């Protein structure tokens, strides 16, 4: 049997009940969890995975450590840190007092407008990511107010895709709500994850 592939993993996270799950884990803990989960994944028969979103450089460092034989794990293709809009699903400051943090920048994964979208993609390229992860709608495992509303404009999504293609990077999007999915497909992303509330009655894009 050939090695299996998993196209959506988050090695640095451990899913427990909502009551037990911390809102944020420390980077050191994330690195330990990611290394352990990579080893378990390889032993389970998966030889290639796509890591779609973490808190920073953990998956990039893990990918390189596996590649040079320092630790055991599958081959990893990673987006590094996700890209969100202010208050969106992957905004790391959601649920915190404005007195406790500075507004996150595109380099830190939060954008507003096409110009900042280009900045965020170029930073991911500089960081060593293989692709881009956008959170184009709300989600379940965050403290964003909505789980399905669109959180990127079409122009922002198109800017991300355009910049990513310039650097040979794929674009995967987290999407639960139909409007965000539609914008992502029109923008030309490579994959749409989750699709929880997809509407199949209205075609978004037809193959030639």
Report residues per predicted region.
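Metal-cofactor-binding active-site regions of metalloenzymes
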Residues: 13, 17-20, 72-107
């Amino acid at each position: 049997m050939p090695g299996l592939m998993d196209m959506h993993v988050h090695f640095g996270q451990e899913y427990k009940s909502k009551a037990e799950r911390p809102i944020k884990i420390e980077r050191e803990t994330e690195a330990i969890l990611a290394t352990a989960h990579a080893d378990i994944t390889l032993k389970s028969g998966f030889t290639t995975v796509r890591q779609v979103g973490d808190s920073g450089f953990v998956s990039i460092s893990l990918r390189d450590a596996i590649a040079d034989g320092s630790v055991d794990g599958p081959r990893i293709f990673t987006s590094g840190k996700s890209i969100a809009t202010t208050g969106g699903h992957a905004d790391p400051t959601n649920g915190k007092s404005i007195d406790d943090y500075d507004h996150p920048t595109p380099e830190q994964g939060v954008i507003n407008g096409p110009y900042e979208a280009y900045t965020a993609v170029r930073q991911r390229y500089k960081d060593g990511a293989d692709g881009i992860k956008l959170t184009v709608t709300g989600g379940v495992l965050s403290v964003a107010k909505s789980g399905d509303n669109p959180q990127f404009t079409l122009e922002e999504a198109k800017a991300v895709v355009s910049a990513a293609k310039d650097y040979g990077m794929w674009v995967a999007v987290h999407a639960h709500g139909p409007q965000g999915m539609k914008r992502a497909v029109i923008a030309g992303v490579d994959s749409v994850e989750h699709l929880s509330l997809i509407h199949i009655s209205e075609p978004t894009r037809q193959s030639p």
